[in-house]
Amino acid sequence: MSLNFLEFEKPIAELEAKIEALRDVSRHGGDTAVDLDKEIEQLEKKSLELKQKIFSDLGAWQVAQLARHPQRPYTKDYLEHAFTEFEEMAGDRAYADDKAIVGGMARLNGRPVMVIGHQKGRETKEKVIRNFGMPKPEGYRKALRLMETAERFNMPIITFIDTAGAYPGVGAEERGQSEAIAKNLKVMAGLSVPVICNVVGEGGSGGALAIGVGDYVNMLQYSTYSVISPEGCASILWRDSDKAPQAAEAMGLVAPRLKELELIDEIIPEPLGGAHRDPIQTAQNMKDMLVKQLEELEQFDNEALLERRYQRLMSYGYC
């Protein structure tokens, strides 16, 4: 798979293009291949150093771009690499099946769990089918149905958050978008099973929160979580969406800042260059964190679990 490089990654892209060109020559270069091996090794070392330098000092706007990277792993990628025996469940049993939300039963290290997450889609056709990862009310009601099923069968719930926000169309509003989100918030706060929420890309406003109330909230290293997009914030504050970089810095939407404010619990590391550089390693990092947290939560009885979650939610806004 050829990688898409972001604007701030252009120096890395140029170096990697040179390395690939030399590899092609080396494969067909006969006697010159030995000399090229040394040059390739030097360029690879230089590329690694450049990546380490760039990714050690990313700004909030650059992180926001990484969170939206078109090759970033989505919910179905984590289902493939971190879980086994996934059985998808469809429909809200009231109106329709919203493809922007995927969910079903799976096993995590052999333990039955319910997995629910946003799914954006890769190709144009899939993006349209999945509405670019922006759920309608029926998507959130499907998620609610799966959560209630999980509670009935005493299965922990794992959610993956990656959406620009809930779909704001007229039809969605007519079918009760705000009610669907609000009901999910209420029900998730009172579920008697462990709930672990993970922001893996964009965590956009109520559309993210609707599957984001839990006992642990984790963020991948280069994900974002905010009430509005940087472009939207810039358009409101400065009437200029080009000021999105300044807005991103002011909003505090990156994982380290949110952990400092105690709005999230853990930051899950990504491979150098971002999750899309090594989705399998990212999924393994995610799995390790989920297994660890699930073991901790399973030590609590129902009453203690609910009290812990209540205290966690009530602590928001206090430093």
Curated annotation (Swiss-Prot):
Q: In which pathway does it act?
A: Lipid metabolism; malonyl-CoA biosynthesis; malonyl-CoA from acetyl-CoA: step 1/1
Question: Alphabetically, which GO biological process terms does the record hold?
Answer: fatty acid biosynthetic process; malonyl-CoA biosynthetic process
According to its UniProt record, where is this protein located?
A: Cytoplasm
The entry's function note states:
Component of the acetyl coenzyme A carboxylase (ACC) complex. First, biotin carboxylase catalyzes the carboxylation of biotin on its carrier protein (BCCP) and then the CO(2) group is transferred by the carboxyltransferase to acetyl-CoA to form malonyl-CoA.
Gene this chain is encoded by: accA
How this chain assembles, per its entry, is: Acetyl-CoA carboxylase is a heterohexamer composed of biotin carboxyl carrier protein (AccB), biotin carboxylase (AccC) and two subunits each of ACCase subunit alpha (AccA) and ACCase subunit beta (AccD).
Q: Which organism is it from?
A: Vibrio atlanticus (strain LGP32)
Upper classification of the organism: Bacteria, Pseudomonadati, Pseudomonadota, Gammaproteobacteria, Vibrionales
Q: Name one molecular function that GO assigns to this entry.
A: ATP binding
Q: What is this protein called?
A: Acetyl-coenzyme A carboxylase carboxyl transferase subunit alpha
